[in-house]
Amino acid sequence: MDAKIKPIRGTNPAEGRPEFQPAELEPSEFLEVAVQPDQPRPSRAEAEAAVKTLLSYIGENTEREGLIDTPRRVVEAYDELFQGYHQCPKEVLERTFGETAGYDDFVLVRNISFTSHCEHHVMPFYGKAHIAYTPVERVVGLSKLARLVDIFARRLQTQEHLTAQIAAAIDEVLKPRGVAVLLEAEHTCMSVRGIAKKGATTFTSRYTGVFRDNPAEQARFMSMVRDRG
């Protein structure tokens, strides 16, 4: 499902350089299950046949012992790798807790590992997500933020889109005073093909509310993310 986002030039006060931030997403584009149960799709047999066709395309003998079960295994792997299409981000965030004891600062969960696949080459990109939000009255279980990342990551993505979806979902469901999301990832479509530059890391960020409006909050978020102590 394609979200209607476009780059908007802004400034990252924490680093003093221009950055691009996506426009607002429509809630229907990121809060619900992406693939409905009654949505027409190819059968498993058709999917396996498609894999077999690709193997033949690269010049392989699809009848040799090592490849006989490969189409089935690939389809099963896709069921796991892209299960995010069948999961609901909104449901993950809806259970919240009110016992905050007057807590009025932001909550940060950093180093959430993730693996996704780029929508251009269907090759993995992987890295870490750092998420902060400033609650109003209620908070969400910390594991739910990691689950949210997994739901969106287990879909075909761009890193920019993934960053925007995570922030928009938290903003829409929890309605906090602000959200900050920073993703850092290595893209295998760049490290193992094309220019083949291993170790190159891509950073994307998204700020809403107090993080967008207050440069000091952005700077504090970035400082805590980078603190390895």
From Swiss-Prot:
Region of interest (Disordered), residue spans: 1-26
Pathway: Cofactor biosynthesis; 7,8-dihydroneopterin triphosphate biosynthesis; 7,8-dihydroneopterin triphosphate from GTP: step 1/1
Signal peptide: none
Gene3D superfamilies xref list: 1.10.286.10, 3.30.1130.10
CC terms in the record's Gene Ontology section: cytoplasm
Transmembrane segments: none
Binding site for Zn(2+): 118, 121, 189
Catalytic activity: GTP + H2O = 7,8-dihydroneopterin 3'-triphosphate + formate + H(+)
Alphabetical UniProt keywords: GTP-binding, Hydrolase, Metal-binding, Nucleotide-binding, One-carbon metabolism, Zinc
EC top class, as a word: hydrolase
Gene Ontology biological process: one-carbon metabolic process; tetrahydrobiopterin biosynthetic process; tetrahydrofolate biosynthetic process
Gene Ontology molecular-function annotations: GTP binding; GTP cyclohydrolase I activity; zinc ion binding
Enzyme nomenclature, EC number: 3.5.4.16
InterPro entries: GTP-CH-I_C/QueF, GTP-CH-I_N, GTP_CycHdrlase_I, GTP_CycHdrlase_I_CS, GTP_CycHdrlase_I_dom
HAMAP family reported in the protein's UniProt record: FolE
UniProt-listed NCBIfam families: folE, PRK09347.1-2, PRK09347.1-3
Family designation: Belongs to the GTP cyclohydrolase I family.
Subunit structure: Homomer.
Protein name per UniProt: GTP cyclohydrolase 1
